[in-house]
Curated annotation (Swiss-Prot):
EC number: 2.6.1.62
Top EC class, one word: transferase
Residues recorded with modification N6-(pyridoxal phosphate)lysine: 274
Catalytic reaction(s) noted: (8S)-8-amino-7-oxononanoate + S-adenosyl-L-methionine = S-adenosyl-4-methylsulfanyl-2-oxobutanoate + (7R,8S)-7,8-diammoniononanoate
Subunit structure: Homodimer.
Protein name as annotated: Adenosylmethionine-8-amino-7-oxononanoate aminotransferase
């Protein structure tokens, strides 16, 4: 047993991995990673893997980014962490100012992961309505079908991915779900369904929560800004807060700094995480407006304070990484560069996948900014997503398909040559799985 194999065995003895059926790893070992650089991960046998999903959508500017790493080192020599109740620090003050200036919002409230950020948004929305009218509480939330907002109980309550949700249904908050349009031809029907729901329950709804334009865990479903604009307008008319979950879509992933910018809508609450620290350290931020903040601003004796906290809220090291990430956006004109890179990747995929599309092995190739996805149809002995994952790893590619959906969400620093190599390996993997169908 070599060092890599020994580590993998120790891992299985002591670790319980997220979103995993651990029994599968008895025959398919965990891969311990020794180091990473750029888009590559390296195991202890020096095998390299292209990180084509940005390590669960968090890594924007490559692993071991020289600038972010240096800013982290600078910060760790001064302050690693301090409680955020009654204390503060320069990195979080700077970050809060920058985020508010970027979004036109007024206040930031911090946590350390996306699900917690959603929980804060739900609580804050409910609490704000409660403070405005204590005798008539709004008790429901509204979300879109096929949505995903995290895996804590509140976040699961407003999601609609059954794989994560069904087991815990008896524990969840009551929530209303309205159909997201599957394509532009369904916009009118989806809006009509929403109108009926709002006519019946509008006065009971605290907030409408949505992932603007792109439902990532919902098989990378892209939907129309036209639908979202009208949905938000009707909700606002009913005094329903708007929560935009940009945990996965924020920081340039959809082609603009934030996806909601493409809709001409500003939410009451904006949830950010994942790419906020460049993939270095856990951090999330909920942004809101003074209109909300001022409802909680009162003498202590009035019991209006928003009493929510996490031990590592606003960690100084994470905030230093987040500021470094924003520096890169500012200095390197990332959004404009990504537009050209996005078109190059999509064109390369169109050309490479054309034979597979003609053979009806692949369909529905789509993209939004730096997100690329398509459906694949294969008969495999094990579930399709696992078969693709394993085959891709043999090609040196890290993918994590969602059911039949293969997607790419690479770091923004990926080069044209790396793209060509990755797509060639991806096509080879699909071809080999197709050829193995009848064996």
């Amino acid at each position: 047993m070599n060092f890599q194999e020994n580590l993998a065995a120790l891992d299985l003895e002591y670790l319980w991995h997220p979103c995993s059926q651990m029994q599968e790893h008895q025959n398919f070992p965990i891969i311990p990673i020794k180091k990473a650089q750029g888009i590559y991960l390296y195991d202890f046998n020096d095998n390299a893997y292209m990180d084509l999903i940005s390590s669960w959508w968090v890594n924007l500017f490559g692993h071991n980014n020289a600038y972010i790493s240096q800013q982290l080192k600078n910060q760790i020599d001064n302050l690693e962490h301090v409680l955020l109740a009654s204390f503060s620090h320069k990195p979080i003050i700077t970050l809060s100012q920058r985020l508010c200036q970027l979004t036109g919002m007024d206040k930031c409230f911090y946590a350390d992961n996306g699900s917690s950020c959603i929980e804060i948004a739900l609580k804050m929305s409910y609490h704000a309505h409660f403070l405005k009218n204590q005798t008539r509480r709004k008790k429901l939330f509204l979300s879109l079908s096929n949505s995903y907002h995290g895996e804590t109980l509140g976040a699961l309550s407003v999601g609609d991915v059954k794989l994560y949700k069904d087991t815990y249904t008896p524990l969840l908050l009551k929530n209303l779900i309205t159909p997201v349009p599957k394509n532009d031809s369904e916009i009118e029907n989806s809006l009509n369904a929403l109108k009926r729901l709002l006519d019946k329950h509008g006065e009971e709804i605290c907030a409408f929560i949505a992932e603007p334009l792109l439902q990532c865990a919902g098989n990378m479903h892209i939907y129309s800004a036209k639908y979202l604009k009208q949905a938000v307008l009707w909700c606002k008319q009913k005094n329903i807060h708007i929560i935009f979950d940009e945990i996965a879509t924020g920081f340039g992933r959809t082609g603009s700094m934030f996806a909601y910018e493409q809709c001409g809508i500003k939410p009451d609450f904006l949830c950010l995480s994942k790419g906020i620290s460049g993939g270095y350290l856990p951090l999330s931020a909920l942004l809101t407006h003074n209109e909300i903040y001022n409802q909680f601003y009162a003498p202590y004796e009035e019991n209006k304070a928003f009493l929510h906290s996490h031990s590592y809220t606003g960690n100084a090291l994470a905030c230093a990484c987040a500021n470094a990430t924003l520096d890169i956006f500012e200095k390197e004109n990332v959004i404009e560069k990504n537009k050209a890179l996005s078109e190059f990747i999509f064109s390369a995929l169109q050309n490479a996948l054309k034979p597979l599309i003609e053979r009806q092995v692949v369909s529905d190739l789509r993209h939004l900014g730096m997100v690329f996805a398509f459906e694949v149809f294969l008969q495999t002995k094990e579930r399709l997503s696992l078969a693709v994952f394993k085959k891709a790893l043999k090609k040196g590619l890290l993918l994590r398909p969602l059911n039949n959906t293969i997607y790419l969400m690479p770091p923004y620093i990926i080069t044209h040559e790396e793209i060509k190599k990755a797509i060639a390996g991806l096509v080879e993997a699909i071809d080999e799985l197709k050829k193995a169908e009848n064996k």
